[in-house]
Amino acid sequence: MASIKTLSTGKPVDLSIRGELSEIADSVNQASQVLSRQNQARANWISGVSHDIRTPLSMIMGYAQRIAGDHEANGNIRQEAEIIRAQSAKIKDLVQDLNLVSQLEYEMQPLHKEPVRLSKLLRSYAADLLNAGIGEKHSIGVDVSSEAETAVIECDARLISRAIGNLVQNSINHNPQGCDIFLSLDCSSEDVSITVADNGVGMSAEKLRELEEKPHYMESTDERLDLRHGLGLLLVRQIVEAHDGIMKIESTPQSGYKTILTFRWPRSLK
């Protein structure tokens, strides 16, 4: 029954059953093989499209950047070229997210796990963001509990940083009026939790429920912004689940937004 349930989620299985149920097992295995080939074909197609888009997109970004930096060009033209460059960069990020979501969903993205000290990872991310320039309307802070200061887990540091970055960018995008962003780390004897929170516009219980059900379709709580949470939040969930973790979202209108990423079995760095 567990294997059939797994198959229903879109993941292939392999049943080894003899006797009267062997024919059923064979049928399930055949269906699993077909599903596996379909998943492989879908992931390969997305990867191919992503690769084909990157080259012309890089050319567009390069030409736009050159025009935007040409001081002899008309001011309006330079401004429009900068808009093209910025929007092209967003498309490039979306293509990368789409490819990574696909690879994680079909378990085709290799995880390069190693012992990672999470307090160091959080502080390094915050420092890099501040050095790159977060903007005057937003601020970022890091809070690490004394218990979590030396907490270490086996993870892919690049992907965990990507998840944190997507959550921070989500707070920035959906709070153009400005907000404070907080990164915190805490742990217990059973798990370690990374929390990304802000004190921005938040969302209603209904919108929160919709977001949890369809994270890649959810619209912004502020209709004037015409923003969507996009693939970013879906990618965070895929990364967390690939590490056998849990993602939980908490929010209320005008009281901020919080995402908690929980991973089991932390270890202290000796």
Predicted regions mapped to residue ranges:
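Conserved micro-motifs of the catalytic ATP-binding
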Residues: 106-111, 150-155
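A conserved beta-strand-to-alpha-helix junction within the catalytic ATP-binding
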Residues: 112-127
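Acidic ATP/Mg2+-coordinating residue in the GHKL
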Residues: 198
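Short conserved segment of the HATPase_c
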Residues: 203-219
